[in-house]
From Swiss-Prot:
Keywords: 2Fe-2S, Aromatic hydrocarbons catabolism, Dioxygenase, Iron, Iron-sulfur, Metal-binding, NAD, Oxidoreductase. GO terms for molecular function: 2 iron, 2 sulfur cluster binding; biphenyl 2,3-dioxygenase activity; iron ion binding. GO terms for biological process: catabolic process. Pathway: Xenobiotic degradation; biphenyl degradation; 2-hydroxy-2,4-pentadienoate and benzoate from biphenyl: step 1/4. The keyword Phosphoprotein does not apply. This is Biphenyl dioxygenase subunit alpha. Its EC number is 1.14.12.18. CDD domains: RHO_alpha_C_NDO-like, Rieske_RO_Alpha_BPDO_like. Its cofactor is [2Fe-2S] cluster; Fe cation. Residues 58-174 form the Rieske domain.
């Protein structure tokens, strides 16, 4: 059988000489709304992130419809570790490290496909779709003395490392840590806000249009935080050209006034966050146009969605953004969803795809696909705006003084409580930074607390 996490125990906890637990905790001051800029640029912190954050979090790898048939597979990443996600004979899904246990070569080098087995191109070790080592060239000659008896080599001991796998309403998540809480516990009270996009119909969702991939030279936390907490940029300067381009011909910017009425959500545990406007469809209209806006907010499909997600007044919610910590981000109503794969402290690789209601009319699915190409893909007008800001921030962070500054995360900190009882969980004003403070506080805890005994919900 394939190796489990317990077969490859990590070394005892060691800390960088620069980053003790107390030093890490001092980087994020949620009570006073201050962030140390080194969290975005320090190489030692990044190496610890790979172990403490990406080695212990539930990471979104794709959608069940990416691998519908037995033997269908998708190669992706958990942090910087390459993995293979495979549909099994019993229709379950396995995820295992894309690393041959002989000399560490990548087992599968294609993006995806269908297979009955995987063979390493270096020495020909072969694994079945469950990750079991099933064939070793010259096994008897290489590992035995050609006498009867124990060869001292058991193929069952040499399968690739297996991750835990759980799904949430079509999304596939994996986790390396056997001690981490189950997925639903990890998602905490964020699930109703995810359901706004994932549970609108009994047919569920499906991924369309393939997976688009591109690299942005910025730290992964800038992207994750923006989708977690930052409606502020959309309401100020960042997206004016994109908004204008998306308006119907008979409208101009003078007819669009972004709302000041809205909320954001900070999860009780886990660093997840979301934000949205209330009773104002102008942002959705300007991004995806009238056809999708009408489908998402009016008519039978919208009414069914409201019945299926009774915890939230979803017909009043517009322009929602959300991040499931650390790197799963999406925009309900626009329906882009992506994982931010870290590539060092100064680079992130974006893997994005489009989700639609599985029973939506074909013309609606196609409209979602086309609007996402226009707005939120590698060349999309809004994606370009966001990326330009993140890239320039990271360039600034090269400087010694720039990395030594304290950044302001005080929005909403001293404002009277804006908690909205219509929305479950802890909520704040839409132009606050409550969700961002929650995200960075959880990041700080994961980085400084090596045991789930203190970290768990």
């Amino acid at each position: 059988m394939s190796s489990t996490m317990k077969d490859t125990q990590e070394a005892p906890v060691r800390w960088s000489r620069n980053w003790t637990p107390d030093a890490i905790r001092a980087l994020v001051d949620q009570d006073n709304g201050k962030l140390d800029a080194r969290i975005y640029a320090d190489q030692d912190l990044y190496q610890l992130e790979l172990e403490r954050v990406f080695g212990r979090s539930w990471l979104m790898l794709g959608h069940e419809t990416h691998i519908p048939k037995i033997g269908d597979y998708l190669t992706t990443y958990m942090g910087e570790d390459p993995v293979i996600m495979v549909r099994q004979k019993d229709q379950s899904i396995k995820v295992f490290l894309n690393q041959c246990r002989h000399r560490g070569m990548r087992i599968v080098r294609s993006d995806g496909g269908n297979a009955k087995a995987f063979t390493c191109t270096y020495h020909g070790w072969a694994y079945d779709i469950a990750g079991n080592l099933v064939n070793v060239p010259f096994e008897k000659e290489a590992f035995c003395d050609k006498k009867e008896g124990d060869c001292g080599f058991d193929k069952a001991d040499w399968g690739p490392l297996q991750a835990r796998v759980e799904t949430y309403k079509g999304l596939v998540f994996a986790n390396w840590d056997p001690e981490a809480p189950d997925l639903k516990t990890y998602l905490s009270d964020a699930m109703p806000y995810m359901d706004v996009m994932l549970d609108r119909t009994e047919a569920g969702t499906e991924a369309i249009g393939g997976i688009q991939k591109w690299v942005i030279p910025c730290n992964w936390k800038f992207a994750a935080e923006q989708f977690c907490s930052d409606m502020y940029h959309a309401g100020t300067m960042s997206h004016l050209s994109g908004v204008l381009a998306g308006l119907p011909p008979e409208m101009d910017l003078t007819q669009i006034q972004l709302s000041k009425n809205g909320n954001q959500f900070r999860s009780a545990w886990g660093g997840h966050g979301a934000g949205w406007f209330i009773n104002d469809s102008s942002i959705l209209l300007s991004v995806v146009g009238p056809k999708i806006t009408q489908y998402w907010t009016q008519g039978p499909a919208a009414e069914k969605a409201a019945r299926r997600v009774p915890q939230l007044p979803i017909l009043d919610m517009f322009g929602q953004h959300m991040t499931v910590f650390p790197t799963c981000s999406f925009l309900p109503g626009i329906n882009t969803i992506r994982t931010w794969h870290p590539r060092g402290p100064n680079e992130v690789e974006v893997w994005a795809f489009v989700l639609v209601d599985a029973d939506a009319p074909e013309d609606i699915k196609e409209e979602f696909r086309l609007q996402n190409i226009r707005t939120f893909n590698a060349g999309g007008v809004f994606e370009q705006d966001d990326g330009e800001n993140w890239v320039e921030i990271q360039r600034v962070m090269r400087g010694h003084k720039a990395k030594s500054t304290s950044l302001c995360a005080k929005m909403g900190l001293n404002v009277p409580n804006k908690n909205n009882p219509a929305y479950p969980g802890k909520t704040a004003y839409v132009y606050a930074e409550e969700a961002a403070r929650g995200m960075y506080h959880h990041w700080s805890r994961m980085m400084s607390e090596p045991s789930w005994d203190t970290l768990k919900p």
